[in-house]
């Protein structure tokens, strides 16, 4: 009797894990975006390009810091609210949400993170 209960509990745990699991689209901390939607690597590349820009009359009016601030505002993107479709933008769900898809990787929607996703 105890073995049947243990097997049923394991099966229930496995099924709930499969249903609530979200496939990892990108691994590592480098895939995380800052508040402007720009990765750290892209930000470094933008700063490097600004430093290497040739000086002309249009650029002389702005320092590198002002140009970076202006470029940040143009690259902002809005996030996708909960229950919104995220098929083509899996990393753009709003804060405390994640893009969750069905078993075949379609019908993706931004939904509340599961308990284990919040913990890391």
From Swiss-Prot:
Keywords: Disulfide bond, Ion channel impairing toxin, Knottin, Neurotoxin, Potassium channel impairing toxin, Secreted, Signal, Toxin, Voltage-gated potassium channel impairing toxin, Voltage-gated sodium channel impairing toxin. Residues 1-21 form the signal peptide. It is found in: Secreted. The keyword Secreted applies. Disulfide bonds join 79-94, 86-99, 93-110, 101-108. Residues 22-63 form a propeptide. Belongs to the xibalbin-1 family. This is Xibalbin-1. It comes from Xibalbanus tulumensis (Blind cave remipede). The lineage of its organism: Eukaryota, Metazoa, Ecdysozoa, Arthropoda, Crustacea.
């Amino acid at each position: 009797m105890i073995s049947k209960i243990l097997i049923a509990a394991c099966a229930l745990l496995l099924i709930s894990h499969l249903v609530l699991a979200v496939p990892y689209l990108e691994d590592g901390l480098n895939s995380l975006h800052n508040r402007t939607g720009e990765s750290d690597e892209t930000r470094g590349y933008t700063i490097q390009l600004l430093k290497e820009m040739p000086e002309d009359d249009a650029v002389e009016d702005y320092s590198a810091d002002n140009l970076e601030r202006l470029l940040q505002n143009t690259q902002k993107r809005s996030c996708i609210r909960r229950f919104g479709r995220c098929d083509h933008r899996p990393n753009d769900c709003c804060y405390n949400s994640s893009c969750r898809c069905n078993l075949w990787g379609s019908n993706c929607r931004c939904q509340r993170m599961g308990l284990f996703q919040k913990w890391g």
